[in-house]
A protein has these predicted regions:
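N-proximal low-complexity "stem/linker" segments adjacent to membrane-targeting elements
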Residues: 1-30, 34-38
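Hydrophobic helical membrane-anchoring modules
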Residues: 1-3, 187-210
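Donor nucleotide-sugar binding loop of glycosyltransferases
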Residues: 13-16, 50, 108
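Short beta-strand/loop segment that forms part of the nucleotide-sugar
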Residues: 32-49, 73
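Conserved donor nucleotide-binding strand/loop of the catalytic core
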Residues: 41, 55-90, 94
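A conserved acidic beta->alpha catalytic loop
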Residues: 44-55, 105-106
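Acceptor/aglycone-binding surface of glycosyltransferases and processive sugar-polymer synthases
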Residues: 74-76, 80-90, 97, 109-186, ...
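Short beta-strand-to-loop acidic/aromatic patch adjacent to the donor-nucleotide binding site
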Residues: 94-106
């Protein structure tokens, strides 16, 4: 049975971290109970130089749940994309498949099971895609559309309405780790990896877990 690592980049997440940990541990427990992932699957919180109690709370969660929760403490604030990359590279040697998700859990954790199912059916990358942007303001919706159009004009392949909520197989992460980019934009790099891909669709919660 494949070992899953859920990678969660964190910056000043003290208000949501314990709630996120509980929710994600629930996902692990459910998938383990259904026989879809290994019993030693885990959550990897990546502390991106937080200035609040984020790291302290990660340590507390690890002490309370040593098998399911672990953490990586970066030396300073390197930004979301680099923190996520650090988590993926760390998880690469410790797991067979990864799922990345933000700590606020605005992305629907319920579709992680569908991602795992698609992985078992041969997919190396599964994108989490928002069904629509009804909860966004007019400004955010318009600028998002403009962003994707600019990316398309520049020849950058992206999946519309996908951020960084995705599943990656071990070999997909290994291939990604070979890229030597200084200005990381993971959404634009994923299609370059190749391998079989698919999408899962969900409604994004405009509220965080708090």
């Amino acid at each position: 049975m494949e070992k899953l690592a859920i990678v969660v980049p964190c910056y000043n997440e003290e208000e949501v971290l314990k709630i996120a940990s509980e929710a994600l541990r629930g996902v692990l427990d459910d998938l383990i109970h259904k026989g879809k992932i290994a019993e030693d699957s885990f959550i990897l919180f990546v502390n991106d130089g937080s200035k609040d109690r984020t790291w302290e709370l990660i340590e507390e969660e690890h002490q309370a749940h040593p098998v399911q929760v672990c953490g990586v403490k970066l030396a300073g604030n390197v930004g979301h994309q680099f923190a996520l990359t650090a988590g993926l590279i760390t998880a690469m040697d410790l797991s067979d498949v990864t799922v990345s998700i933000d700590a606020d859990l605005q992305d629907d954790v319920a579709v992680i099971e569908e991602m795992i199912d698609k992985f078992h059916n041969g997919c190396d990358i599964v994108y989490g895609v928002r069904k629509e942007r009804k909860t966004d303001t007019f400004f955010k919706r318009t600028t998002a559309q403009g962003f994707y159009k600019v990316m398309e004009m520049m020849g950058v392949k992206t999946v519309y309405n996908h951020a960084d909520f995705r599943l990656m197989s071990k070999r997909a992460v290994e291939q990604f780790s070979k890229y030597q980019e200084t200005n990381l934009f993971l959404r634009g790099m994923m299609p370059l990896i190749g391998y079989q891909t698919d999408c899962v669709y969900y409604d994004r919660d405009r509220k965080s877990v708090v």
